[in-house]
Amino acid sequence: MAEPSNRYTLTAARAHGKPGREVRPASTTIDMHAHMVVDEAAALVAGHIPADPRVQFFPEETRILTRKQDEDRHRYHTDLDLRMSVMDEMGVDMQIISPAPPQCYYTVTPDLGVKVAAMVNDGVAAFCARRPDRLAALGTVPMQAGGAAAAEELARCMGKLGMKGVELLTHVGEKELSDPGFEVFWDKAEALGAVVMIHPNGFTEARRFGRFYFNNVIGNPFDTTMALHYLIFDGVLARHPKLKLIAVHGGGYLPAYSGRIDHAWGARSDSHGELKEAPTTYLKRVYFDTIVFTPHQLEALVSLFGPDHVMMGTDYPFDMGEYDPVGHIVGTKSLSPTAISAIAGGTAKALFGV
C-alpha cells in the first residue's frame, strides 16, 4: 500500500480560474458551514463514547487517514489566527461556526450528553466572541436526552450565549429527527426563530459503505437525504411553516430527484401520510449550502430553490471541504451578479441576522 495521503486544497471536481480573494461579489461573503472542536468537551467524554461499529468495515487506509485528519486539522479547528488567515485566503469575510459533527456526542448517556452539550456550546461561543466582527455561532443540543432537554439548551444557546441556532445530526440513534418525542424541540426552534442546520456524521449502515471512503462520500449525503424525507413526510415542516432549516452538502440527493417524492405522494396512500400539499412544497422552504463542487450542480440547486435559499459553505477544515467557495459561485456563469451576491453572503446575512 502506498503512503496514505489526503489533501486540503482546491477540488478536483472542476476547473479553477482566479481564486475567490481576487474575484469579489458585491456582498459581504459569509461561509455558513464551518466547524471547530472544543478540547475540554473531548476530554470530558473520553472513555465514555461507545465503540463505533462502522469502523470494522473500513480498510486500514481509511482508518489511517481518519486519524491523520484529526491530527493534521486540529490546529485549524482551534487556532483563531490561523482560521482568520485561511478565511482571508479564501476571500471569506465571515464564518458561521458549528461544532465538528462528532462533538454532538449523541451516543453518550443522556446525563453526560446534557453536560457535554453545554460545554461544547460554551466553548464555541467563547471562541466566536473573540472576533465577533467575523464569527458567529451555531451550537448543539442533547437530543438523546429528549426534546425538552434539547429545547432547554436551545433556549440557552439563543439567549445567554447569543448563538444563531444549532446543528443537529441527521438521526439520534435509531430515532429519526421527526420522532414525536422531539416535537417540543421543533416548537421551540420555530418560536425562537432559531436556525437549525442538519449535518450527517457518516451513514449508519456501513457494511456496503466501507471501501473508498464511501461512508462519507455516499453516506453523508444519503443520510441527509433520509433525514429530509422524514422531516417532510412526518409533517415536521408542515407543522412548523416558519422553521429555518438548512440541509448541508446541497441537501444530499433529494434536490436532484425531488420529483419522485411528489410522484409517490400522489400514487400511493402509504406515501401520502398527512401531507395536504405535495412534498416538494415543504422542501422549497429548506435552505441549502453550495458544497456540491461543480457549476452544473450549483446551477440546478439555484434554479430549483432560488438564490434566496442557497448559501455559500466550505465544510472547513475537512478534506471533503470546498476551499475556493467564492470562485465556485463566481465561476458558475449562468448566475447573475444579483444571484452571486445573494448566494455569497446576502441570503446568509438575512437568515442568520448578522
What do the PLM-derived regions correspond to, one by one?
Residues 1-28, 32, 39-94, 122-130, ...:
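Mid-to-C-terminal alpha-helical segments outside catalytic/metal-binding sites
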Residues 26, 35-77, 204-222, 261-283:
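Active-site gating loops and adjacent loop-to-helix segments of metal-dependent hydrolytic enzymes
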Residues 30-32, 95-97, 136-139, 166-168, ...:
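Hydrophobic faces of well-ordered beta-strands that scaffold small-molecule active sites
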Residues 37-39, 103-105, 144-145, 174, ...:
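Active-site environment of divalent metal-dependent phosphoester hydrolases
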Residues 66, 132-137, 163-165, 241, ...:
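Short, surface-exposed connector motifs at secondary-structure boundaries
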Residues 93-234:
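Active-site gating/metal-coordination segments in enzymes
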Residues 225-228, 267-272, 290-294:
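A general structural motif
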Residues 232-281:
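Aromatic-lined glycan-binding groove of carbohydrate-active enzymes
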